[in-house]
Amino acid sequence: PLIFGRRMNGIGFEYMVASESVALSSMGFEVIRDLEPGEVLYINTKKEIHTNIIPEVSQSPCIFEWVYLARPDSTIDGVSVYKARLRMGQTLAKRIKESNLEIDVVVPVPDSSRSSAITLAHDLDVKYREGLVKNRYIGRTFIMPGQSVRNKSIRYKLNPIELELKDKNVLLVDDSIVRGNTSKLIIKMVR
């Protein structure tokens, strides 16, 4: 995704281009619009805007933008990331209702799955709890080199709150599964 906007300064407009709308709004820029797939934007030194679209380019959005990478207060292609995550929770709730599972508590894997988990718990009429604490000083584990480094980092990154998990049927909600190794370790920690 790519979005551009403008703001007035003392001598005219200045422009900003970013992958998320929140980058523009937090700096006081007005969003003009999202760029289309295959579109090129050029702003010359006279601040004239030129665009060109390469024909026959289909849009192929990356799901990781919606579930993991984008901030919830962003908008991508005119759709609120937060609202999209709420809808994901609603969709998941419908599927889980059909399974007749006994769930005592819904716990998000921090942070991006939180809004989906809250909606899911509400729609299932089940308690929502913060059962895992995230160490904010550990980076993104799925991009770390080597499985042993990732495993070690996951253990340092998340710590369970036993009070919220002990002797309960816990439904963990994560934003995505890349390799599945993170999920296995988190489940082991929660048990």
Describe each region flagged by the PLM:
Residues 1-112, 121-155, 160-161:
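N-terminal segments that mediate ammonia production and transfer
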Residues 153-191:
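PRPP/pyrophosphate-binding module of the type I phosphoribosyltransferase fold
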